[in-house]
Amino acid sequence: VTGVGKVKKGEIVSTGGLKPGDEIVMTKWAGLEGTSIIAAEKEEKLRETLPQELIDVAKGFKEYLSVIPESKIAMEVGVSAMHDVTEGGVFGALWELGEASGVGITAHLDKIPIKQETIEVCEVFHLNPYMLISSGSMMIGCEKGNLLVEKLNEAGINAAVIGRATEGNDRIIVSKDETRYIGPAGSDELYKI
């Protein structure tokens, strides 16, 4: 697939612009697109254990797949890097952001926004929701993460500061007393079902 477009000079923000000390803001929720796809394509299996209302909500996650609104707000606040969270999910996107920028990443699992519907759908198929295709979410690097979150929330877009860029190359997820090193995304969790 090839895409062509026009951008004003000086307005391109790449995945590779993150600097040590930058905060990492994540928009919306982990696993959005994957949850929507699974709920639509595996509805019968999900009905065996989950209520129809939850499945319907999960199918509706497709309404969140555009990242244009948050991109515009991020540009107004000022950012160093932006990366859409697609195949490989949140963990894959964090690794890609760090790799493209030549920095380390420290992110906190308990700060990563996730919907209960995603957790429950993933439990049925034994999937890691943080490694599930998450189109509709963005990772944004900036100096003023809390300001960006505030502006996004004012516009009705869920967002959270989930970590920061560090010196070095370690890309880690901190969960309570555990530290997990992440690497390049392998096959997306969606392909396991």
What are these regions (language model features)?
Residues 1-193:
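Helix-biased detector of long, well-ordered alpha-helical tracts
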